[in-house]
């Protein structure tokens, strides 16, 4: 994968891939650690899907010569993301496992469509913010140190943010909700360079987490177990 990046994306950020590899490695180590306590070990399966994902990543990088073509599917990516996030809520194919309704079952096979939504949301955020960056930075009004964009310029991004909140409220998936919101804030910061957005987002995370902890039992149990 590193070789493919060097050949096809030599100007890509050199830190992202090593960080992802380290995080994935830590996850694999933790899974193998608890495998002995599970009736059906999943470490080897996770390792297989890791290898397959790396292969798919290499193929995409090799054949996607110009990443700017993804701007053409900005709104398609948003629509696809919303559809994927709604699928587990459907009564026929949606499945609730361990208190979280994030699975769909088709022909006896279970799958988390939210995993694909993470990719399509990243494509949407990148495409939309790169196109509307100047409007977000310049248009709107300033309140203290924070430059607020016009609401109409952030409507699509706001919809994506609502989708992440919906994941928490309706699917009881705290991890994915935090990841979606973190992705939203990271992309917004990279686009604008405004630290104030990170502060505002951090306040939103703390406030939302506090409310979820006291109002959603599944979230309370997850946080309690982690602490």
Where does each model-flagged region fall?
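Hydrophobic alpha-helical transmembrane segments of multi-pass inner membrane proteins, especially
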Residues: 1-11, 15-227
């Amino acid at each position: 994968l590193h070789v493919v990046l060097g050949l096809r994306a030599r100007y890509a950020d050199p830190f992202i891939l090593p960080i992802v590899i380290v995080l994935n490695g830590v996850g694999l180590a933790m899974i193998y650690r608890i495998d002995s306590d599970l009736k059906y070990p999943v470490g080897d399966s996770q390792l297989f899907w890791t290898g397959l994902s790396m292969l798919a990543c290499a193929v995409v990088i090799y054949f996607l010569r110009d990443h700017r073509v993804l701007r053409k599917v900005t709104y398609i990516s948003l629509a696809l993301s919303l559809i994927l996030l709604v699928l587990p809520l459907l009564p026929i194919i949606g499945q609730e496992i361990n208190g979280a309704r994030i699975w769909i079952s088709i022909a006896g096979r279970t799958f988390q469509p939210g995993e694909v939504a993470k990719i399509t949301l990243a494509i949407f955020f990148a495409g939309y913010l790169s196109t509307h960056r100047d409007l977000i930075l310049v248009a709107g009004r300033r309140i203290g140190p924070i430059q607020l964009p016009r609401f109409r310029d952030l409507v699509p991004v706001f919809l994506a943010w609502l989708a992440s909140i919906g994941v928490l409220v309706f699917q009881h998936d705290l991890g994915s909700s935090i990841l979606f919101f973190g992705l939203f804030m990271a992309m917004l910061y990279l686009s604008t360079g405004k630290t104030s957005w990170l502060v505002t987002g951090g306040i939103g995370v703390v406030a939302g987490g506090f409310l979820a902890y006291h109002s959603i039992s599944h979230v309370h149990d997850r946080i309690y177990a982690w602490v």
